[in-house]
A protein has these predicted regions:
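Terminal alpha-helical anchor/extension segments at protein ends
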Residues: 1-219
Length: 219
């Protein structure tokens, strides 16, 4: 008669079952997160998604996302499971600000490059105002604290010659000290065009390179 000690094998099998159960529970939870994101997108549509958590969990979550949701992921942040709400919010805001900065800098450089090559873009107050008056603006771009006063904004005839101070703008009488930006933005929106407001470094870059105003054009 031989006596076989199976306690070690039993313990190993028990650990394996526990591990499988834990993994299945985690995957079930991640699927619930994905379902919640889909429901949220239906009620409150969003265009960017930041994932946070332990790196392995984040990777698995991203793998489970549908293609449309995966394309909206702008960053993944490694956070411990026990991270509190304040830590999560701070990291989310930091990542979002970095994303905004990169996006706005990229937009600004693309605008300046296209304008320099005369490829469906213009940079500078006179050219942008002229494009707005002609209904050619596709996307208006300016810094958050920007102002364009009538006294500093000449009309530029189509033949490119001369220029006089504006006394009327988009059918509205104006004074030399009036800020035209509100009228410009309203007209842009009315024409079905987009408006992009720059912050921080991107806004400074546009001010230095193009007096703070530019636009991508329809034609």
């Amino acid at each position: 008669v031989r006596h076989v000690d199976a306690s070690g094998k039993d313990q190993t099998r028990s650990q394996m079952r526990f591990q499988r159960n834990a993994e299945e529970h985690a995957k079930h939870h991640l699927k619930k997160v994905v379902a919640a994101l889909k429901d949220l997108d239906k009620t409150v549509p969003f265009d960017r998604l930041i994932l946070g958590g332990p790196s392995r969990t984040v990777a698995e979550l991203e793998r489970l996302l549908s293609e449309p949701l995966r394309h909206r992921v702008v960053s993944a942040v490694t956070l411990p499971v026990e991270a509190d709400r304040k830590t999560v919010l701070e990291e989310t805001l930091r990542v979002d600000e970095e994303f905004e900065h990169r996006t706005e800098m990229s937009l600004t450089e693309a605008l300046l490059t296209a304008a320099a090559k005369n490829r469906m873009a213009t940079a500078g107050v006179a050219g942008t105002v002229r494009a707005a008056l002609e209904g050619r603006v596709r996307t208006l771009v300016y810094p958050r604290d920007f102002a364009v006063f009538a006294k500093d904004c000449p009309t530029v005839p189509a033949n490119g010659g001369g220029g006089m101070p504006l006394t009327e703008f988009l059918g509205e009488p104006i004074k030399p000290e009036d800020n035209l930006l509100d009228l410009l933005v309203e007209n842009t929106a009315r024409e079905g065009a987009k408006v992009e407001v720059l912050h921080g470094e991107a806004g400074l870059r546009l001010k230095e390179a193009a007096d703070g105003l530019g636009a991508f054009l329809r034609y």
